[in-house]
């Protein structure tokens, strides 16, 4: 499902405009397809975007709040929108994942991740199940395993955030 389109950014801060009617969440995993493979992206921030100047937005808000005036915006979906800040996680080529060292193409479409995008995740010889992969608030049917032999002989930090 198409979620948006990349419009600008830099390495570590890729900016995409959200498609009207779609929802993007912090922590969501998205995919930008390219001629070289698939670039897996993770959303780390969301901000508002508008073609209307800040001064005019404040005036429209004041008119609605203070004088109960109704405003109809021409092409509201084109003028006001959400922007997603993303970072590149990996480049996937076939069943292999590589450190991403390039940006997705300008105006590349981004879509939600599917299970077949994650073929590079394999089950180790001595699997220790740690849970299913999350994308935003959704839990995907993709089990995540660590190598049990290495887990029990090393100290491991599993970091995560909650409450968002």
Label each region the model flagged.
Residues 162-164:
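ATP-binding Walker
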């Amino acid at each position: 499902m198409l979620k948006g389109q990349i419009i600008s950014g830099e390495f570590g801060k890729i900016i995409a405009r959200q498609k009207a009617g779609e929802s993007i969440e912090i922590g969501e995993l998205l995919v930008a397809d390219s001629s070289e493979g698939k670039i897996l992206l993770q959303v780390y921030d969301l901000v508002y975007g508008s073609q209307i100047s800040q001064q005019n937005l404040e005036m429209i808000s004041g008119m609605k709040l203070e004088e109960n005036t109704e405003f109809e915006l021409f092409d509201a979906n084109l003028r006001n929108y959400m922007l997603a800040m993303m970072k590149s996680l990996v480049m996937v080529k076939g069943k292999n994942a590589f450190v991403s060292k390039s940006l997705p193409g300008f105006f590349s479409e981004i879509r939600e991740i599917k299970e077949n995008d994650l073929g590079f995740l394999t089950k180790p010889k001595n699997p220790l199940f740690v849970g299913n992969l999350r994308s935003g608030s959704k839990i995907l049917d993709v089990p995540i395993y660590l190598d049990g032999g290495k887990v029990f002989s090393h100290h491991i930090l599993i970091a995560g955030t909650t409450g968002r």
